[in-house]
Every structure is written in C-alpha cells, then in structure tokens.
Amino acid sequence: MTSAIRIIGIDPGLRRTGWGVIETLGNSLRFIASGTVMSDGDMDLASRLCQLHDGLADVVHLHQPDEAAVEQTFVNKDAVATLKLGQARGIAMLVPARAGLPVAEYAPNAVKKSVIGVGHGDKQQIHMMLKILMPKAEFKGNDAADALAIAICHAHNRGGERMRRALAG
C-alpha cells in the first residue's frame, strides 16, 4: 500500500514568502497547513534573506514534507526588483534542498492551469478552486493561497519526466 506524499508549495517573495503544505494520495488532496514568512523591510537585504531562510526552515522542520515545489519567477521591467525576487527564490529552493527534499519548479501559468483549468486566471478563481479541492483549506492572503496552488500543481504533475529525474537524484 502506498502512503500519502506530503508536499510543500512555496511562493517566493522578499517581503512575503507564502507556503502551503498538503498531502496527496492517489487523486485525493488533504490540506495540512499554510502561512506566510515575512521579512522586515527596514532591514538590509542579507538580514531579510536570513529571516526568510530561518522562517522556511522552521516550517519544513515542523511539517516534514517529502517533496517541495517552488514557483518560477518572471522578469519585470524593474531589474532591481527582479534580482531581489530571484534571491528570495534562491532561499525558497535552498531550504527544502538542504533538508534533502526534491524540489520541482513550475511557471505561474502552469500552476493556474493545473488548479483552475486555464493559464490566465485571477486570484479569486484560485481561492474558489482551493476551497473546492480542499474544503478544509485555510489561507490568509494571496501568498499562502498561491503556495497551496503550487503544491496542488506539483501533486498533479509529480509523475512527470522532470520530477522523476529529480527524485532519482
């Protein structure tokens, strides 16, 4: 008999990094927890990255996921903001990798398509589908909701070739 796989989805951001933990067994999804790790905007960049690292490390230690999924970042017109987001994303990938978890990456439109059926939807559609897919899901804010959507996307796609290679090491 196969056991449930616990997945952490991470929505990286320098101010707020959302996280969501679910379990999947076959086609069923079960909400475990979600939240947001915050960094202090008055602190220097290195200290803010440490806050994100330590907060995510605490979440991974507490919830003991088996696999992780992180949303890929997009490039916007503000190069400095894009670089900072990339650094936060590096932390979001490093923490689960250091815990020995395979880490998958998903584009934002792939996450939306997996959860709401189309690649371009709004936050309200994601919130509604999260409640349909996992009626007991609790999330405060878009970052935690997005992280749960990333975890669901991974649950739906974890059998893919790229993930099989990551799991094989």
Swiss-Prot record:
One of its GO terms (biological process) is DNA recombination. It is found in: Cytoplasm. SUPFAM superfamilies: Ribonuclease H-like. Its main location: cytoplasm. It catalyses: Endonucleolytic cleavage at a junction such as a reciprocal single-stranded crossover between two homologous DNA duplexes (Holliday junction). GO terms for molecular function: crossover junction DNA endonuclease activity; DNA binding; magnesium ion binding. Mg(2+) 1 binds at D11, D143. Pfam families: RuvC. Mg(2+) 2 binds at E71. Its EC number is 3.1.21.10. Keywords: Cytoplasm, DNA damage, DNA recombination, DNA repair, DNA-binding, Endonuclease, Hydrolase, Magnesium, Metal-binding, Nuclease. Its cofactor is Mg(2+). GO terms for cellular component: cytoplasm; Holliday junction resolvase complex. The active site is at D11, E71, D143. CDD domains: RuvC (cd16962). Binds 2 Mg(2+) ion per subunit. The RuvA-RuvB-RuvC complex processes Holliday junction (HJ) DNA during genetic recombination and DNA repair. Endonuclease that resolves HJ intermediates. Cleaves cruciform DNA by making single-stranded nicks across the HJ at symmetrical positions within the homologous arms, yielding a 5'-phosphate and a 3'-hydroxyl group; requires a central core of homology in the junction. The consensus cleavage sequence is 5'-(A/T)TT(C/G)-3'. Cleavage occurs on the 3'-side of the TT dinucleotide at the point of strand exchange. This is Crossover junction endodeoxyribonuclease RuvC. It comes from Allorhizobium ampelinum (strain ATCC BAA-846 / DSM 112012 / S4).
